[in-house]
């Protein structure tokens, strides 16, 4: 998980935290990987927000796991409230894992991508969506996500629950605004 295309950053106006921390590693990965890097960035992860409603539902299925999740996400709930006034937290890495397991969760487009390694835009991903640079496409930039599919898969695994029960519950619950 890392990077962003059109989304604002989460540690600077233009950079996602992982790429901001080590922009040289991110740049080298895009440059030397030898295949298209599939960028699960903030553009898709911002659509996956764990809310108090999710936690309440989860506690009814698996209270022990939910207590743990509540404890480890408290910092992120506080962060997103302080900086973005969101009551909930964006759970970036679970979406990357879900996409790795089931590529139908996200979709996007191929492009040449580079990473800014110094200056005010440190860590920003520069995505050449319109082929201005005429360079080989070294990435797939994920821009669309199916939140329903993500939540079905994520909650089924995390809560050790039956998928058909989770699917039915999600149809009847209002977990998102």
Tell where the protein language model's regions lie, with residue ranges.
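A broad, low-specificity signal for short, low-complexity segments enriched in glycine/proline
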Residues: 1-2, 59
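Active-site glycine-rich loop that binds ribose-phosphate moieties when present
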Residues: 2-28
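Residue-level marker of positions within ordered structural domains that often coincide
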Residues: 3, 34, 102
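Conformational coupling and interaction surfaces
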Residues: 20-24, 37-177
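A structural motif corresponding to the C-terminal end of an alpha-helix
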Residues: 28-37
């Amino acid at each position: 998980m890392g990077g962003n295309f059109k989304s604002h950053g989460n540690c600077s106006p233009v950079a996602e935290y992982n790429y901001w921390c080590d922009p040289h590693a991110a740049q080298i990965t895009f440059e030397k990987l030898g295949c298209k890097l599939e960028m699960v960035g903030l553009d898709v992860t911002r659509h996956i927000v764990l809310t108090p409603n999710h936690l309440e539902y989860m506690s009814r299925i698996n209270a022990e796991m939910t207590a743990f999740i509540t404890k480890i996400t408290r910092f992120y709930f506080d962060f997103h409230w302080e900086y973005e006034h969101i009551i909930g937290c964006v759970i970036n890495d679970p979406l990357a894992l879900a996409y790795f397991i089931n590529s139908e969760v996200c979709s996007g487009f191929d492009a040449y991508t580079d990473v800014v390694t110094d200056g005010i835009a440190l860590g920003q991903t520069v995505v050449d969506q319109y082929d201005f640079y005429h360079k080989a496409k070294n990435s797939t930039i994920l821009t669309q996500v199916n939140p329903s599919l993500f939540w079905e898969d994520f909650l089924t695994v995390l809560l050790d629950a039956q998928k058909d029960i989770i699917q039915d519950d999600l149809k009847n619950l209002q977990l998102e605004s």
